Regions:
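Positively charged n-region of N-terminal signal peptides that target proteins for export
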Residues: 1-4
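Thiol-based oxidoreductase modules, predominantly thioredoxin-like and allied folds used
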Residues: 81-99
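C-type cytochrome heme c attachment motif
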Residues: 60-67, 117-118
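Typically the conserved alpha-helix immediately C-terminal to a functionally engaged Cys/Sec
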Residues: 52, 64-79
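Non-catalytic, surface beta->alpha helical segment in thiol-disulfide oxidoreductase systems
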Residues: 114-158
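Sec-dependent signal peptide cleavage junction
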Residues: 15-35
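Extracytoplasmic/secreted envelope proteins and their assembly/folding machinery
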Residues: 69-76, 97, 101, 134, ...
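Short active-site neighborhood of thiol/selenol oxidoreductases, capturing the structured segment around
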Residues: 47-60
């Protein structure tokens, strides 16, 4: 009977260690992926330089937001020389919500319950996201970069 209990304990211990190892590997994979598509900007990160500023307001867990982050990752190597991307999570962060409210007021937009993603490229607004918007996003980045001297910089956002 003692041998049976010892064998059961050893099997349960081995099974538990295997589950922990698999869980750890999965978490490491998720963390690696999220590092590639996760942005946690602060208002103090915002720079006003020779690039177009892009402000992305998102909600943690929003699938459309995640798809938009993935899209920005896919164009980063070719287009990031044209823009600074600042992303603010607004569902769980009240301070970031105030930043979104600032832009909503500037663009005279009314969105309910922090509708996300809410994207601003230079002085143009995009509400929501689907892959059908991809070319429009690239065209807007290029156009705003070419005309960046004529775009309001919203530097007063730093006073929030």
């Amino acid at each position: 009977m003692k041998k049976f209990i010892v064998i059961i304990v050893i099997l349960l211990t081995g099974l538990s260690m295997g589950i922990i190892t698999l869980s750890s590997q999965k978490n490491n994979q998720e963390n690696t992926n999220s590092k590639n598509i996760s942005y946690e900007s602060k208002i103090t990160d915002i720079k006003f330089n020779d690039k177009v500023n892009i402000y992305l307001f998102y909600g943690k867990g929003c699938p459309h937001c995640e798809a938009l982050f993935t899209y920005f990752e896919s164009i980063k190597s070719k287009y990031s020389k044209y823009y600074n991307l600042y992303a603010f999570e607004v569902w769980y962060n009240e301070d970031n919500g105030k930043i979104m409210d600032y832009f909503l007021e500037k663009f005279d937009k009314k969105v309910s319950s922090r509708s996300v993603p809410f994207l601003i490229i230079g002085d143009e607004v995009f509400e929501g996201y689907s892959s059908s918007m991809n070319q429009k996003i690239i065209d807007t980045i290029e156009e705003k970069y070419k005309n960046r001297d004529n775009i309001k910089d919203f530097s007063d956002v730093l006073n929030i």
